[in-house]
């Protein structure tokens, strides 16, 4: 188990970029709200601890984890955010519904990351039982929401740094190759 030997709430503030000027969106599923509220609290507290002003954190609720995709998409389109964290919890039941929801949410959030220029951080627990979710939302393994907030700060910083123009940056062709503008070289003879 990936979190068995790791506390999700631990981070070294000295390794995290300055986040005071970033603006974050958090989209929270209301399904399994005991868990998602714990995850939200972990994310919110970590952002505040990393100097993000509370007024620069926008929260939207959606009914369930599947709706996180649409909520995140609309937040990306309408809010001026540097990153979005999606928070949900899907717990294995007796049917295949768990598999469909987990796959759909995972692919939907992946698609948003591919299609947009703003990072969307995946904080959706997909556990076998309620105890595993409790353990990862402020329990014995810490809080996945905290980990997601730190990831959001780091990704917002990467986005910011990547947008800074450098003289060696060249536009890419649709094939992924560098587009290099040819400039004729004039050789003057004396």
Swiss-Prot record:
(2S)-2-hydroxy-3-oxobutyl phosphate binds at residues 94-95, 136. The keyword Cytoplasm does not apply. It comes from the Bacteria. One of its GO terms (cellular component) is riboflavin synthase complex. The active site is at residue 97. The keyword Metal-binding does not apply. Pathway: Cofactor biosynthesis; riboflavin biosynthesis; riboflavin from 2-hydroxy-3-oxobutyl phosphate and 5-amino-6-(D-ribitylamino)uracil: step 1/2. PANTHER family: 6,7-DIMETHYL-8-RIBITYLLUMAZINE SYNTHASE, 6,7-DIMETHYL-8-RIBITYLLUMAZINE SYNTHASE DMRL SYNTHASE LUMAZINE SYNTHASE. HAMAP family: Lumazine_synth. This is 6,7-dimethyl-8-ribityllumazine synthase.
């Amino acid at each position: 188990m990936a979190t068995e030997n790791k506390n999700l709430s631990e981070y070294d503030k000295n390794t995290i970029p300055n986040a005071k000027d970033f603006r974050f969106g958090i989209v929270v599923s209301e399904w399994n709200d005991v868990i998602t509220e714990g995850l939200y609290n972990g994310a919110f507290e970590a952002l505040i601890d990393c100097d993000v002003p509370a007024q620069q954190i926008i929260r939207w609720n959606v009914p369930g984890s599947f709706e996180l995709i649409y909520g995140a998409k609309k937040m990306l389109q309408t809010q001026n955010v540097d990153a979005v964290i999606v928070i949900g919890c899907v717990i294995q039941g007796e049917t295949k519904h768990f598999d469909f929801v987990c796959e759909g949410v995972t692919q939907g959030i992946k698609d948003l990351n591919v299609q947009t220029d703003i990072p969307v951080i995946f904080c959706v627990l997909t556990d076998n039982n309620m105890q595993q979710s409790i353990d990862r939302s402020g329990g014995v393994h810490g809080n996945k929401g905290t980990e997601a907030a730190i990831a959001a700060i780091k990704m917002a910083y990467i986005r910011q740094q990547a947008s800074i123009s450098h003289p060696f940056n060249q536009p890419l062709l649709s094939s992924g190759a560098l587009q290099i503008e040819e400039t004729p070289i004039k050789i003057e003879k004396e």
